[in-house]
Amino acid sequence: MRKGKRGGMIMNPVKVFSVAVTSFLAALSVSGQDSVPSPHEMRGPFPIMSTPYFEDGSVDYESLAKESVWVADSGCPGVIWCQSNDAIDLLSIEEKFKGFEACAAALEGRNCVLTLGANGTNTAEMIVMASEIEQVAKRHPHTKIAMISRPPDDVRSQDEIESAWDALGKISKRPIIFQTYGTKSTPTPDVKLLIRLAERHPHAFGYVKEEAAGWGANERMLQECAAKPPIKTVFAGWGGWQWLLQLRHCGSQGLVTERCAYAPILAEIWRRYERGERGVELAEAYAMYRLLIDQRNFPGGLRGYSLYLLNKVGACRSMVSRQYEDAKVTEGGSFGAGRKWKLTTTKLNDLQKKELDCLFKDMMDFVSKGKTAAL
């Protein structure tokens, strides 16, 4: 340093720049940059958690945190909350914020991407959710955090979807998975729109949960995967009913589904895929998964008999669900309208429970043998 004409101290400009850069990098770390997952980490099975409730219908945040750890410890590279239709629509904003915090705290230091739902009845509400997720990331810099977003409920055109997600891309510091299905009233975003947004906001976009109906999902997936590198990962949806085909032939490198009770077998499928298996080794793991989710004479839906397995691993303490007052429950999820809900309880008989116990053991034994064989 040297003195100026007025006796003040003049810093060496190189040192000033060095200090400024150090301060800037420190600020980035504090602001949640450490929590930003890489594109490579945004691949594989990302199960959506089923929200656990107490008997009175209030959210069981302790069990929610345990559920996130169950998925992470099972080997899945990511876990999602809250993104099921009923969770998006029937939880209050305050309940979502509290759940975000519980999951982020539970996954501190774990090698699993916590992907939180940035959704809303309109763009403004979606931005509120995304802004809170960024705040959660600041408070938990050692938790890898991403977002997932479906089109806001009030959009009715491609231009409106683009405008909404463009606003989201401008405020997000982290990857965002586009969910192509919103509600029965929102249009499916065009593939060209998804590519355009990925090119415009490459730090955030380029991840797609493809949810077109039936065979159309495969056709769109091929188009999306052909648009790499702006498009980075295309996740299968709808329970993974076509995931084997999509892994082998359509370029899918991930799955988003509310099947977190089966996290161990989903992780095993992915491990086999990652080590290059494309034949019977991959098919048999997928067949085990399909067996587990296809007990058709049991209480169905994504919150049907799966809740029993979540209770079994300590990720849930009841069989209670919030349900739309006018709900239509299918294997694809719970569908309804509005924010009013009722409580329902999934009931199983002794024989059903006995078989689920056997199936759970089958899954865990299969996964254990798979890990041993890979050594």
Q: Over which residues does each language-model region extend?
A:
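Boundary at the C-terminal end of the N-terminal hydrophobic targeting segment
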Residues: V30-D34
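A general structural signal for well-ordered alpha-helical segments in protein cores
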Residues: F100, M126, A130, L194, ...
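Glycine-centered loop/turn motif at secondary-structure junctions
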Residues: G75, N111, E134-P141, H201, ...
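Active-site beta->alpha loop and helix N-cap motifs at the rims of alpha/beta catalytic domains
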Residues: S35-T188
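Bacterial N-terminal signal peptides
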Residues: S18-A27
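Structured C-terminal cap/extension of enzyme domains
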Residues: E62, L245-L375
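Short, Lys/Arg-enriched N-terminal segments with co-localized hydrophobic residues
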Residues: M1-I10
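Catalytic alpha/beta core domains of metabolic enzymes, predominantly
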Residues: A167-P175, G182-G301
